[in-house]
Amino acid sequence: MEKEVAILGVGMHPWGKWGRNFVEYGVKAARDALADAGIEWKDVQYVAGGDTIRNGYPGYVAGATFAQALGWSGARVASCYGACAAGSQAVSVARAHILAGNCDVALVVGADTTPKGFFAPVGGERKNDPDWQRFHLIGATNTVYFALLARRRMDLYGATLEDFAAVKVKNAKHGLDNPNARYRKQSTVEDVL
């Protein structure tokens, strides 16, 4: 028998550099999602937290961190790390637990705080790690790395600068309707280029 899974509510903290702990952002989003769904925290049976590596141990165990901040309730917890995909991994883990019959109500929470400037790899010397190599050997920050990938896509598949600009235009359009979006200004392909 197939069991349906649905997202009943959503919440979001406004994007930006607000100078507070990532837990505050996650708790606000979680409470907003619960209110949007009409579900009380005590009814949540499972919490999947999207991990962040830039916030010390609480970031590594984000599921437990968010559950504790919301008020321990006995809900099971999981922490999921997948860099920029940690949130989607947390959704996948929560879905799997619902489908397995481990819970009926799950809460997925993801939040992060980042330093200003470029993201340097996590400390330590790891000469077999491509992320470490690109940063330390050739100075390729994330911006450079993604620019190189974009150029490769242009060479392999014929993508154009206008194609990439169209993505920014589309994203800006969506931001206009979202009061929590970081960028809320309409743009055109010409503006971007």
Describe the role of every protein-language-model region.
Residues 67-93:
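Aromatic/His-enriched, Gly/Pro-containing loop or helix-boundary segments
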Residues 90-98, 104-106:
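Thiamine diphosphate
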Residues 1-76, 99-100, 110-193:
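Conserved "HGTGT" condensation-loop signature of ketosynthase/thiolase-family condensing enzymes
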